[in-house]
């Protein structure tokens, strides 16, 4: 039996191979019989096309037969099916693999496209996004450096610019695609933390010297129904869950501006340091949008980082009828926006954007082998300089294809 390691070892030979194995039917033979036959390469295009055709057929069959969004199966009922699987022994061919997948996954998958599905914020997806997903998986670009992505870098940057223009963040804005709202919120609060800490006396900065003694006094203010990713972010940032101070909401489930003002005053009186205020544009449970303008003005008057979690409601930037609900976002220092929610994109597709691109320096590290500082000075657009990730999928392609084909 050949393994993944065997495939990697023979990659060089496979790239130039024209073996007969590569021309045979992809789902009627075993890929384990020849590591060369399993590699995506020019020699295996017939096999790739055959496999993609079969997978497309399977998806169509599944969607045509789905009667409800979810079967309701429990973990206890499904887990035994995995108990005796031997991952060291591959199945005989693609058809066998797909049959197994139907039983283990597709039969009980959650079908978000179904008109009766309303349980979560996951959305049905548009065709351009699905087509792009197939393309980006095949080409497999990594968006960390220019020399690995070229045009992909510029596509992503143009989409970031489009997003910040729609949000009204101004000409100094910038950002980066992320895996989702949780990562975007983490990144935004990291930037807020480091922006506050670099202003402290006798502290040379978090990146080189770690957190200052004052870090235990940093606080984040958000409504009592804001997303739990804020607590997770504060834990990861060394501040702890309790660094998030919940602010009361009004009868419309929006952050109460007066309650925020009181909370900020009380924190100052107790010697605490307001690090950031997070306004939610679309709460998970109610879809409520905090009074962004009032909160933004409060933050600006006090010199506090203003973050808008628009993971859910950010899609309103495309709405002529309802876009006014996001008025005030233009005052934000950072914004989270999930394209894989109200933009109908396949998971994952999200972004964290900032009003002042220089704040992105807090996530920058120059590695000589990858993104040396000289390249940055010369203007090479290495996206890793403003990302928490290094290797990163070309998820921006999904939104790009959608805008180019649908508008």
Listing of model-derived features with the role each one plays in the protein:
Residues 48-51, 55, 59, 93, ...:
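General structural feature for long, well-ordered alpha-helical segments within catalytic domains
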């Amino acid at each position: 039996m050949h393994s993944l390691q065997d495939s990697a070892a023979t990659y060089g030979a496979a790239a130039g191979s024209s073996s007969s194995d590569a021309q045979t039917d992809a789902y009627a033979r075993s890929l384990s019989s020849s590591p060369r036959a399993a590699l995506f390469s020019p020699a295996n295009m017939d096999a790739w096309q055959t496999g993609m055709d079969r997978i497309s057929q399977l998806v169509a069959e599944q969607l045509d037969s789905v009667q409800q969004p979810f079967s309701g199966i429990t973990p206890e009922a499904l887990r035994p099916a995995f108990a005796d699987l031997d991952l060291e022994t591959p199945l005989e061919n693609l058809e066998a693999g797909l049959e197994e997948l139907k039983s283990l996954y597709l039969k009980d998958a959650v079908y978000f496209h179904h008109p009766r599905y309303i349980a979560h914020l996951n959305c049905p997806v548009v065709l351009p996004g699905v087509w792009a997903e197939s393309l980006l998986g095949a080409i497999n670009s990594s968006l960390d450096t220019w020399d690995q992505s070229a045009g992909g870098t510029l596509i992503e940057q143009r989409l970031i610019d489009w997003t910040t223009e729609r949000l009204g963040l101004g000409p100094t804005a910038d950002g980066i695609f992320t895996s989702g709202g949780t990562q975007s919120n983490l990144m935004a609060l990291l930037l807020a933390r480091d922006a506050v800490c670099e202003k402290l006396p006798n502290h040379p900065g978090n990146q080189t010297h770690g957190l200052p003694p004052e870090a235990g006094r940093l606080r984040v203010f958000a409504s009592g129904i804001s997303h739990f990713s804020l607590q997770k972010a504060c834990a990861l940032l060394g501040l702890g869950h309790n660094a998030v101070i919940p602010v009361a909401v009004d009868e419309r489930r929006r952050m109460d501006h007066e309650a925020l003002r009181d909370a900020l005053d009380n924190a100052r009186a107790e010697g605490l340091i307001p690090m950031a205020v997070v306004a939610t544009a679309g709460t998970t449970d109610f879809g409520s949008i905090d009074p962004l303008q009032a909160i933004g003005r409060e933050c600006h008057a006090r010199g506090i980082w203003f973050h808008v979690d628009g993971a859910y409601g950010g899609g309103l930037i495309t709405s002529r009828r309802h876009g006014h609900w996001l008025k005030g976002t233009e005052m934000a220092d950072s914004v989270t926006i999930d394209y894989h929610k109200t933009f109908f994109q396949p998971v994952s597709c999200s972004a964290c954007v900032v009003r002042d691109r220089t704040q992105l320096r807090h996530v920058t590290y120059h590695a000589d082998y990858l993104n040396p500082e000289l390249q940055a000075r010369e203007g090479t657009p290495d996206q890793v300089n403003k990302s928490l990730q290094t290797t990163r999928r070309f998820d921006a392609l999904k939104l790009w294809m959608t805008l180019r084909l649908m508008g």
